[in-house]
């Protein structure tokens, strides 16, 4: 299973894997690979930045997620979202909360 991995500046430490089941035979025409994402999710992520192309069959393991879980989601829905570790999510939530409070009392 081949996939492309994207990151999003609005979402630190979040990565989206997009299935490329027909690779390399799918490169003849330009395609919106992120079109498989639900519209609301895609809009909330902001502008994508391509990171890399990955052949999961050649990859023994992934850094923070289970490779089998990634493959299952790629096959069933065409994408996999790797969320940030819980400590990063907590820090982001706290920063947004503080920012909201600061704006409220300015």
Curated annotation (Swiss-Prot):
Domain named YcgL: residues: 1-94
Signal peptide: none
Pfam families: YcgL
PROSITE patterns hit by this protein: YCGL
InterPro entries hit by this protein: YcgL-like_sf, YcgL_dom
Source organism superkingdom: Bacteria
HAMAP family (alphabetical): UPF0745
Family matches, as PANTHER family: PROTEIN YCGL
Name of the protein in its database record: YcgL domain-containing protein PsycPRwf_1721
């Amino acid at each position: 299973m081949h996939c492309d991995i994207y990151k999003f500046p609005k979402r630190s430490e979040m990565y989206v894997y997009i299935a490329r089941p027909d690779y390399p035979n799918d490169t003849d025409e330009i395609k919106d690979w992120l079109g498989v994402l639900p519209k609301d999710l895609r809009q909330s992520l902001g502008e994508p930045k391509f990171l890399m192309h990955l052949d999961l069959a050649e990859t023994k393991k992934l850094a923070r997620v289970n490779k089998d879980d990634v493959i299952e989601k790629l096959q069933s829905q065409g994408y996999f979202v790797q969320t940030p570790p819980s400590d990063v999510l907590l820090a982001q939530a706290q920063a947004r909360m503080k920012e909201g409070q600061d704006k409220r009392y300015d």
